[in-house]
Amino acid sequence: MGKKNGSSSWLTAVKRAFRSPTKKDHSNDVEEDEEKKREKRRWFRKPATQESPVKSSGISPPAPQEDSLNVNSKPSPETAPSYATTTPPSNAGKPPSAVVPIATSASKTLAPRRIYYARENYAAVVIQTSFRGYLARRALRALKGLVKLQALVRGHNVRKQAKMTLRCMQALVRVQSRVLDQRKRLSHDGSRKSAFSDSHAVFESRYLQDLSDRQSMSREGSSAAEDWDDRPHTIDAVKVMLQRRRDTALRHDKTNLSQAFSQKMWRTVGNQSTEGHHEVELEEERPKWLDRWMATRPWDKRASSRASVDQRVSVKTVEIDTSQPYSRTGAGSPSRGQRPSSPSRTSHHYQSRNNFSATPSPAKSRPILIRSASPRCQRDPREDRDRAAYSYTSNTPSLRSNYSFTARSGCSISTTMVNNASLLPNYMASTESAKARIRSHSAPRQRPSTPERDRAGLVKKRLSYPVPPPAEYEDNNSLRSPSFKSVAGSHFGGMLEQQSNYSSCCTESNGVEISPASTSDFRNWLR
């Protein structure tokens, strides 16, 4: 019976270990154990003295099994003191009849507690092992997934890098293949050109050789036809004759080739010489053609006509003395700011002044020459011969000066003034002394050159304006500018104004020679 109970208790312990520990199961197990015990008591009834050892014997065997089950499990603090509290009184000096019931009651109370705690510990161990196994499996799965993912990513990156390297290598291979093909093509083309040139040269040489061979063969045939001897000859004699003919043909070919080469060289040299001669002829013909073209140019006629027109225009040369300053006294002398008259007006006033009687001034006068600034007008020796001097000397006490005007024109001013004097009134007619003075001044004076005169001759002004026509000298009152209002009263005031203007011009410009570019300003000032 003890074995059965032990086996049943072991099976129940195993079953309880695999079941989830709950309070209901624990209470049910306790109730089942009590019911089994009751059934056993019903079937096996014994006296009380015998039942106690049976009970003790029935209860005592499972104790070591439970202890063997709980070897690994730590004993709880409640069980240890229970053993300590229960065992000492059993060893006390009492009769065995009193000890047995106490042991049975203690065993009855301690057995369910031990079983309960053993089941709990076993269940906790199982739960922990299962949970730890679950965690380990989950970590393993996660690790496997991570490893797979890393392997995939790394494999993708590696494949991508490998593809890029392969593409780069393919591109390099393509470029190298193209370069090699191009080099091969160029070398092939060069070889073809060289081969073509060589073949062309060989063809030309062969062609020349064929021609020479044909010529030699024809000559040999002609010579053979002419010189061939029908008489029988030995083989040695025939060989000698053939060798001789071949030698002559070779010499003839060599001479022909040398002649052809010399002719070719002569042609090239002749062509070069003819080209050089042609270039020399062209260089010699160019200036001739240029001269002919310049001789027939269209603007030459216009230039010649312009020169002839310029030669026709006469230019008045006025000589003004600047070596000696002019003296101005009295209130009748005009101011510098007044505007001088035009060239035509000056000529008119010179004509009107010529009608007054005047005496020569003792003061020495030196002429200042106002020459032409235009390079177009050239001197004519006939005009130099036909020069006429016109001088006017004032006898007024306030102004003593002597002007000398030289006009390069076909007719002199003095003759025109003398001829026009008859048209003037009697009170304006010139006297005999004035006419004699004019005649005496008409011839040019020959003065010896001195250093003072040479130095004074350097200080000159250049002006050019055309000589007015002779009709202007005939009218005395009509040729006046409308802007010239200051001399409308009398000729004497005009004379003073003009003389003062000339003196101011000379005093302001002492030591200055006006260039042709600056003559326009002086013309504007004289207007």
UniProtKB/Swiss-Prot annotation:
May be involved in cooperative interactions with calmodulins or calmodulin-like proteins. Recruits calmodulin proteins to microtubules, thus being a potential scaffold in cellular signaling and trafficking. May associate with nucleic acids and regulate gene expression at the transcriptional or post-transcriptional level. It comes from the Eukaryota. SUPFAM superfamilies: P-loop containing nucleoside triphosphate hydrolases. InterPro entries: DUF4005, IQ_motif_EF-hand-BS, P-loop_NTPase. A motif (Nuclear localization signal 1) lies at residues 2-9. This is Protein IQ-DOMAIN 18. Belongs to the IQD family. Binds to multiple calmodulin (CaM) in the presence of Ca(2+) and CaM-like proteins. Residues 146-161 are annotated as: Calmodulin-binding. Residues 377-388 have a biased composition (Basic and acidic residues). Residues 1-98, 300-401, 434-480 are annotated as: Disordered. Residues 1-11, 49-59, 352-362, 391-401 have a biased composition (Polar residues). The keyword Cell membrane applies. It is found in: Nucleus; Nucleus, Nuclear body; Cytoplasm, Cytoskeleton; Cell membrane. One of its GO terms (cellular component) is cytoplasm. Residues 120-148, 149-171 form the IQ domain. CDD domains: IQCD (cd23767). GO terms for molecular function: calmodulin binding. Residues 75-92, 330-345 have a biased composition (Low complexity). Keywords: Calmodulin-binding, Cell membrane, Cytoplasm, Cytoskeleton, Membrane, Nucleus, Repeat. Pfam families: DUF4005, IQ. Signal peptide: none annotated. A motif (Nuclear localization signal 2) lies at residues 22-29.
